[in-house]
């Protein structure tokens, strides 16, 4: 009789078999099951000396779809897939179970072979048998369908993510066209005014007082910074949350950076008659941080505070030496606050409150702030009550003395 060696099911090309008795041995990589698998293989090899059958070994780690197809809950497991009905042997006594079932399996094999002989007479005109193939082929096809189903699900998720990114980019392009117009117009007016009043021969500005010249130069500089900040924020967030965030940490006096940013945004909160209250102790320790990155955080948080605080409202800025290793900074406003159900989501990329859909912005500012603070091994969070404003807090490491 033809004897079949042990075979490993190919991960890419499952083996199709016509053997009358077909078995699948499911194994895993656990050291505890290794000895049991070796004993099962040895016993099957003894049986192969006398009987015709085929065993295919399947590593569940490499082919989980087959394990899912047979709904296996434990390994090792030995499955008779042909002739039908299918039967699963599992547990610590597989060899004992095999000895018990083997005679009945042989009876089923004899019955199958007898049926094959009887059906040899049923041939079509081209000499092809009409007996369906009941082999590992059906198992492989089912497993492949499961794998393809999982792959389709994964691709659908990727497609949804890409569509979300495309929608975000479309929204950003539309918003950029709107939001960039204001600072561009302001900068252009300031520069054109300076240019039209500049005398090349004398090298002086005509009809402009020194204070007005300084104001126009500051206006042009501030507006170009606004444009640069918009573009920088978009590029950094567009890289994705898993992208490495480069930092150049150094000794920073954050209180001074706070005051510089407040001065930069002075025109904005002054235009809304907003009061700015600062409480930054003079003995606040230096922090270990990237000044440009932290400046981005301060600009974003203060920009939001100005945007959402009504005219005549108050913005508060404070610093606190929380521990020997951390310094906490806080920015509060008297705006509408943040609903409780949205406090955990406001740091998500592209997330915006429904009430803010009509306001300028891209839903990336707080996400960017969180990425920067986390990159500094700090924390950022919000305290808020509806109609009572919001307080944003973040911590940074103290510069080691």
Swiss-Prot record:
E.C. designation(s): 2.7.13.3
Q: Which reaction does it catalyse?
A: ATP + protein L-histidine = ADP + protein N-phospho-L-histidine
EC top class, in one word? transferase
- Highest taxon of the source? Bacteria
Annotated Histidine kinase domain ranges read 175-400
The reply on keyword Amino-acid biosynthesis is: no
Residue positions of the PTM Phosphohistidine?
A: 178
One of the protein's GO biological processes: circadian rhythm
Q: Which InterPro entries match?
A: HATPase_C_sf (IPR036890), His_kinase_dom (IPR005467), HisK_dim/P_dom (IPR003661), HisK_dim/P_sf (IPR036097), KaiB_domain (IPR011649), Kinase_SasA (IPR023527), Sig_transdc_His_kin-like_C (IPR004358), Thioredoxin-like_sf (IPR036249)
> What Gene Ontology molecular-function terms does this entry list?
ATP binding; phosphorelay sensor kinase activity
Keywords, in A-Z order: ATP-binding, Biological rhythms, Kinase, Nucleotide-binding, Phosphoprotein, Transferase, Two-component regulatory system
CDD domains assigned? HATPase, HisKA, KaiB_like
Domain comment (free text): The N-terminus interacts with KaiC, while the C-terminal histidine kinase domain autophosphorylates and is probably responsible for self-oligomerization. The N-terminal domain stimulates the C-terminus to autophosphorylate.
Function recorded in the entry: Member of the two-component regulatory system SasA/RpaA involved in genome-wide circadian gene expression. One of several clock output pathways. Participates in the Kai clock protein complex, the main circadian regulator in cyanobacteria, via its interaction with KaiC. KaiC enhances the autophosphorylation activity of SasA, which then transfers its phosphate group to RpaA to activate it. In addition to its output function, recruits fold-shifted KaiB (KaiB(fs)) to KaiC to cooperatively form the KaiB(6):KaiC(6) complex (independent of SasA kinase activity).
User: What is known about its subunit structure?
Assistant: Homooligomerizes. Interacts with KaiC. Participates in the KaiABC clock complex, whose core is composed of a KaiC homohexamer, 6 KaiB and up to 6 KaiA dimers. SasA and KaiB(fs) compete to bind to KaiC.
Name of this protein: Adaptive-response sensory kinase SasA
């Amino acid at each position: 009789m033809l004897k079949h060696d042990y075979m490993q099911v190919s991960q890419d090309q499952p083996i199709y078999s016509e053997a009358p008795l077909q078995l699948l041995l499911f194994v895993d990589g656990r050291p505890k099951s290794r000895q049991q698998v070796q004993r099962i293989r040895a016993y099957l090899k003894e049986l192969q000396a006398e009987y015709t059958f085929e065993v295919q070994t399947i590593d569940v780690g490499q082919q989980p779809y087959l394990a899912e197809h047979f709904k296996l809950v434990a390994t090792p497991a030995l499955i008779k897939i042909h002739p039908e009905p299918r039967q699963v042997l599992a547990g610590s006594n597989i060899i004992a179970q095999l000895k018990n079932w083997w005679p009945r399996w042989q009876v089923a094999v004899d019955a199958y072979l007898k049926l094959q002989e009887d059906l040899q007479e049923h041939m079509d005109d081209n000499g092809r048998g009409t007996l369906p193939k009941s082999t590992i082929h059906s198992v492989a096809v089912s497993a492949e369908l499961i794998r393809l189903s999982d792959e389709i699900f994964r691709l659908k998720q990727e497609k949804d993510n890409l569509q979300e990114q495309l929608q975000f980019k479309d929204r950003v392009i539309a918003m950029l066209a709107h939001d960039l117009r204001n600072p561009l117009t302001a900068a252009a007016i300031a520069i054109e005014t300076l240019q039209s009043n500049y005398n090349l021969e004398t090298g002086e500005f005509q009809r402009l007082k020194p204070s007005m010249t300084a104001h126009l130069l500051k206006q042009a500089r501030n507006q170009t910074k606004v444009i640069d900040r918009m573009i920088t924020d978009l590029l950094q967030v567009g890289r994705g949350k898993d992208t490495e965030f480069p930092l150049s940490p150094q000794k920073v006096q954050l209180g001074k950076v706070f005051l510089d940013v407040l001065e930069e945004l002075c025109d904005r909160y002054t235009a809304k008659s907003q009061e700015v209250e600062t409480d930054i102790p003079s003995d606040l320790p230096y922090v270990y941080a990237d000044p440009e990155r932290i400046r981005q955080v301060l600009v974003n948080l203060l920009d939001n505070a100005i945007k959402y605080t009504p005219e005549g409202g108050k913005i508060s800025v404070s610093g606190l030496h929380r521990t020997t290793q951390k310094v906490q900074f806080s920015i509060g406003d008297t705006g509408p606050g943040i609903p409780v159900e949205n406090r955990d989501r406001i740091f998500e990329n592209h997330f915006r409150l429904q009430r803010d859909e009509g306001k300028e912005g891209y839903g990336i500012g707080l996400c960017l702030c969180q990425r920067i603070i986390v990159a500094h091994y700090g924390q950022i969070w919000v305290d808020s009550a509806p109609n009572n404003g919001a307080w944003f807090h973040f911590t940074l490491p103290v510069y080691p003395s």
